[in-house]
Amino acid sequence: MVRRLIVMRHAKSSWKDPNLDDHERPLNKRGRRDAPMVADAIFERGWIPELVLVSSSKRTLQTLEGMSHRMGKTPFEVRSGIYHATVIDLMEELEDMLDNGTTMIIGHNPGSEILVNHLSGEWHTMPTATAVLLLHSGSS
C-alpha cells in the first residue's frame, strides 16, 4: 500500500485591512496568480489528489478555488480544525486520509511546515504557495 500526502501552504494573503479578522483575510494579487500555477505544477508532476482537506479560512478556500481548473471534481472537505492547528491536530485530521491514494491538505504555517518536518524527519521551510509530496509505503 502506498499513500501519498500533498501538504500545501495557502497562497499569499492580504494584510491590506488591519481590522479584518485573520480567518477572513483573502488572497492578495500575488496569491491569486500563484494558486493556479501551483496547481499546474502539481498536476504536471503527477501529484493528482483524490481527496482535499482544506482549512476553513478564506485564504485557503480561495487557494483551492484558484486551483479548480486542475482539480475538476476532486472531492474536498472543509475542516475548521486545520486552522491554527498543531502537528497533533493535523495528524488527527489526516486519520481520514485515503488508505491507498493521494490526499492533499491545504493549511497554514507554522502547522504545515511542522507537519512536513515531523513526517519527513528533515527540516523544510514552506513559504506561501508551497506544496510538498510525502510518500508512505506500509500498513500504517
Please identify what each model-predicted range represents:
Residues 29, 105, 109, 119:
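Short glycine/serine/threonine-biased micro-segments
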Residues 81-114:
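Mid-chain, well-packed structural core segment of small domains
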Residues 120-140:
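Domain-level recognition of soluble alpha/beta enzyme cores
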